[in-house]
Amino acid sequence: MNYQAILNQIQGDIQPYLGQGKVADYIPALAGINPSKFGMSIHTIDGITATIGDAQEQFSIQSISKILTLTMAVSLDDTNIWKRVGREPSGSKFNSLIQLELEQGIPRNPFINAGAHVITDLVYSHFDDPKEAILAFTRMVSMNDSISYDYVVAQSERETGNRNLAMGYFMKSFGNIENKVRDVLDVYFHQCSLAMSCTDLSKAFLYLANEGVLPTSEKTIITKKNSDRINALMLTCGMYDSVGDFAYRVGLPSKSGVGGGIVSIVPGEMVIAVWSPGLSESGNSLAGTKALELFVNYTGKTIF
Amino acid sequence: MNYQAILNQIQGDIQPYLGQGKVADYIPALAGINPSKFGMSIHTIDGITATIGDAQEQFSIQSISKILTLTMAVSLDDTNIWKRVGREPSGSKFNSLIQLELEQGIPRNPFINAGAHVITDLVYSHFDDPKEAILAFTRMVSMNDSISYDYVVAQSERETGNRNLAMGYFMKSFGNIENKVRDVLDVYFHQCSLAMSCTDLSKAFLYLANEGVLPTSEKTIITKKNSDRINALMLTCGMYDSVGDFAYRVGLPSKSGVGGGIVSIVPGEMVIAVWSPGLSESGNSLAGTKALELFVNYTGKTIF
Amino acid sequence: MNYQAILNQIQGDIQPYLGQGKVADYIPALAGINPSKFGMSIHTIDGITATIGDAQEQFSIQSISKILTLTMAVSLDDTNIWKRVGREPSGSKFNSLIQLELEQGIPRNPFINAGAHVITDLVYSHFDDPKEAILAFTRMVSMNDSISYDYVVAQSERETGNRNLAMGYFMKSFGNIENKVRDVLDVYFHQCSLAMSCTDLSKAFLYLANEGVLPTSEKTIITKKNSDRINALMLTCGMYDSVGDFAYRVGLPSKSGVGGGIVSIVPGEMVIAVWSPGLSESGNSLAGTKALELFVNYTGKTIF
Amino acid sequence: MNYQAILNQIQGDIQPYLGQGKVADYIPALAGINPSKFGMSIHTIDGITATIGDAQEQFSIQSISKILTLTMAVSLDDTNIWKRVGREPSGSKFNSLIQLELEQGIPRNPFINAGAHVITDLVYSHFDDPKEAILAFTRMVSMNDSISYDYVVAQSERETGNRNLAMGYFMKSFGNIENKVRDVLDVYFHQCSLAMSCTDLSKAFLYLANEGVLPTSEKTIITKKNSDRINALMLTCGMYDSVGDFAYRVGLPSKSGVGGGIVSIVPGEMVIAVWSPGLSESGNSLAGTKALELFVNYTGKTIF
């Protein structure tokens, strides 16, 4: 297939959707983004690439970073992790404390905020300098040493992060956070602030399309089984409270962030990254979701 | 691949798991089943079949019938249906009323009981004799005119169905059941009582592996898009409250029933049906889930 | 004190509040009431009476009937009753099913609908003709043999009672309803339909102001201890989801109904009954609550 | 009545109950208490006093301090307070976050922990040195300048207070905490650590039995209306999740603490304070509740 032609087609189709939705505005650094931005990038495991629009522009990857820390965590300790966090869809908002109370401080899955805190806490316990470790891992998989944290965003998150603090202390009260809550959240807010482009992202997650092996470096990042499992978790839990709707429309393991990015995996074939800051009510990029739906319609590349 | 050889291998591997778990005992007709039963059947879209064990023996398909009525419903009216039932995982027990109250009588998806009631209600409204229509559809897709309801099971369900009645009247109070609650549940209890074998099931659902077209008769049952969507719903909502765990271990769109049956779709390739009455705590066949996990390990046929 | 003068004063004060609020309209028989109706009646245990406005006019007592059946139930069996229903405020709407699910079919108290169903079920089990028994008890305490059910209201309730049916079947599924759900609810809908006047009500509940003894007939209805307890339950659970606000403003054990009636007990002294059909958001008579607040302000007769 | 004789009688009756229940052990300072301690004290508004047992011994008043700060808050600002905290029983545990989420950060009442945080936050905003102000108020109403904070207890609370921190940050995320969460909780943990005796307590709260006026000093602490209202809140919300059961058994406006203290008001007459460290499952002093029940049985002094 001529992926570049398909992306070009999508760029035309997507125009009416640009600027729709609501840009995340809970911190000033995100609120200032131009809502009409749109970029899309593909990397296949065979080395084919295609890009359109603002695919080279860095943005705040936010919750997409949860795949990075989850990958690190399963490679560090893939047994204990599942005693501290579940693998089921939550059926409720990404930042709800209700389920956490009903289920005694065990978050439903690693992609809701509380679950991501636990994963970051686990990573935290394994490194002297966890922020450095996460950054090194990110640069390694994306083969881009210029990637870094956006300290302005991280600081903003920290200042407005009362609900994340509430979750952290709540889990701590159940004994499910090992380190100091503020220290874990400091790392968490930094990972969310990672500034990456669509091109970075579609390259970085190729190991999830290639049975755990990064085709660019032939390095094994995780086992095939764990790669399959992360894909399964992305499909069932990766898109906030609209995983079902997204699976229904797009049907690819995916993870979104409130910065407007979405990463989708076509197992055995490729990674697609898309970015557009306007969000739907469920917190996923509105034009990004539409672009992925078009991509699947044009290529038939759904897992179903 | 030599599917028969793989099934034979699985039959050996599975022996330690037979008789484990708990047979559904809320009605006498199900409680009396021999817990060591085990059958498995494959139908590929190319006409290859393989079976082992009790694959020809009929059992109560229970919630697997929800795929049959959902298929009928989307072919009858695939727009209004999604105003009355969601497409998201529930994050709670299949028969919980909590979410129904919080979300004003709109069930989370068509595979929890409340959602299935709405689907049956929708089917009910389109036919003079809905029980006859569902039976005719089932016989047609499975190409087996001897399939019928088990009236003893249906009667037992009705006598113990207080929680289903509670759900039905609760949704009726929100205006989300059109017909008489008792009439809709009478049809629902009958569809659950359908007695089918693994062979029947792996043949019947071939249209979900073949873009909506039944390869046995070349008849189009639903559109490709709707076929993809039912697969997506099965993956995200088909295995009660362990969809995430099942996707993590097996990774195929599947639907289970408390009779011990599970149907799994390998899109573009085949349908696998398995039956063993012992249930895990989440209500899915314990040996059946293990058999599917082994099948995926031996064949690599996961969607991830 | 000159209670008649105080009631006259209140009748003047209350004029701006008449017609405010929303008349219960879920059944036609209630929706047709003139919203400006207002009546108030006092009976002291010493035989003093005072009335104003529409105090002689019969209206649908609705949930006030829950005191009648609770009184019957505690006199029939005051030990087992508290295994089947709690004594705590619910913290949620009178017809919520959420708590019922979280607490395994045991309603929080006898004054939410589910709790009242259990009480009616208990009464039902003790009589050949429970409807006749409840009516006889009501006539006895109010010394008015002309009181009867309003069969039009009862029939309307039955036709729109889907949520009550949902609760009944839900508790039945937990084993907490002994008789047939429809039979119990038939009695429940009849007790709610009882047509009584303010005068009837302030006379009927004098036993709750007089340590369990009806001063009019010197008949012991219940023990002093049980009388105290029903007053305590009325104070903590009698006013739907605004018991705290009502205790804060009025401070008397009270029970309201969606027909617009409220009964308040001044222990050791008197019973006050008030009626005005316009309801506040919490489902209590708006002018009735105001009238009681004025009464307490003028007389200082609060229990606090 | 001869109150001393009645207390002496109770001291005999209560022996079998001493040492029953479970001493609060979440902090070492509380866990070390002798579970057989028992004291009881009465102060009437006419100046009569009576004491038994360990009535002079200081203990940690814990949640009883919520009456002190609520009294300060209503005298400082009795309008805005009710926009930030409700007046309804919670129907759930004293430290639940579920309701807080469902009701957008507005706690149900001032006596659950979250509600007490809001009250302390409000007091905090009015004073340069809020800890000093609370201590001064406490000494003033109890006429005992030797009362002070137990800094060991306060420090222990702070170290184990993750759940309180979770609540604080959660409400902060809804905008319902004005000051820094840690600062407010520091004050809160100190007020909970106040060491007072039964005698101190029965003297301190006389204003609630005397229409807002402290009879010892003839000082008006709050208006009669606010005094009635605090009594109403104590009755409907003061005993954790067993207010209904307590009202049923004792029937007096009361507030308990996990230190084993309970304060009960007989409006117009007296205050009773009781202390015994063994707690029932609901967190109230077991022998203390029994002693109050006996007192009401012997004296008939219930509000119902």
Curated annotation (Swiss-Prot), chains A, B, C, D:
Xref: NCBIfam families: Gln_ase, PRK00971.1-1, PRK00971.1-2
Gene, per the UniProt record: glsA
Binding-site residues, substrate: 63, 113, 157, 164, 188, 240, 258
GO BP annotations listed: glutamate biosynthetic process; glutamine catabolic process
Keyword entries, A-Z: Hydrolase
Protein's name in the database: Glutaminase
Family in the record: Belongs to the glutaminase family.
EC number: 3.5.1.2
SUPFAM superfamilies cross-referenced by the UniProt entry: beta-lactamase/transpeptidase-like
HAMAP family the UniProt entry points to: Glutaminase
Xref: PANTHER family: GLUTAMINASE
Keyword Cytoplasm: no
Enzyme class: hydrolase
Catalytic activity: L-glutamine + H2O = L-glutamate + NH4(+)
UniProt GO molecular function: glutaminase activity
InterPro entries per the UniProt record, alphabetical: Beta-lactam/transpept-like, Glutaminase
Subunit structure of this chain's protein: Homotetramer.
